[in-house]
């Protein structure tokens, strides 16, 4: 489960950068 946190955080960060 802990290994998914960086993936989710990275995905959200990339989405915010696109905005």
Curated annotation (Swiss-Prot):
GO cellular component terms listed in the entry, alphabetical order: extracellular region
Post-translational modification: Phylloseptin-1.2TR is amidated, whereas Phylloseptin-1.3TR is the name given to the non-amidated form.
Coiled coil (UniProt feature): none
Protein's UniProt keywords contain Secreted: yes
Keywords: Amidation, Amphibian defense peptide, Antibiotic, Antimicrobial, Cytolysis, Fungicide, Hemolysis, Immunity, Innate immunity, Secreted
Highest rank taxon of the organism: Eukaryota
Expressing tissues: Expressed by the skin glands.
Localization per Swiss-Prot or TrEMBL: Secreted
Principal subcellular localisation of the protein: secreted
Listed GO biological process terms: defense response to bacterium; defense response to fungus; innate immune response; killing of cells of another organism
Disulfide-linked positions: none
Modification Leucine amide, positions: 19
Function: The amidated Phylloseptin-1.2TR has weak antimicrobial activity against Gram-negative bacterium E.coli ATCC 25922 (MIC=100 uM), Gram-positive bacterium S.epidermidis ATCC 12228 (MIC=100 uM) and against fungus C.albicans ATCC 24433 (MIC=100 uM). Has an anti-inflammatory effect, since it inhibits the production of the pro-inflammatory cytokines TNF-alpha and IL-1 beta, and induces the production of the anti-inflammatory cytokine IL-10. Has an activity of stimulation of insulin release, which may protect the species from being eaten by predators by causing fatal hypoglycemia.
Family, similarity comment: Belongs to the frog skin active peptide (FSAP) family. Phylloseptin subfamily.
Official protein name in the record: Phylloseptin-1.2TR
Organism from which the protein derives: Phyllomedusa trinitatis (Trinidad leaf frog)
């Amino acid at each position: 489960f802990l290994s998914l946190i960086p993936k989710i955080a990275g995905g959200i960060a990339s989405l915010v950068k696109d905005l």
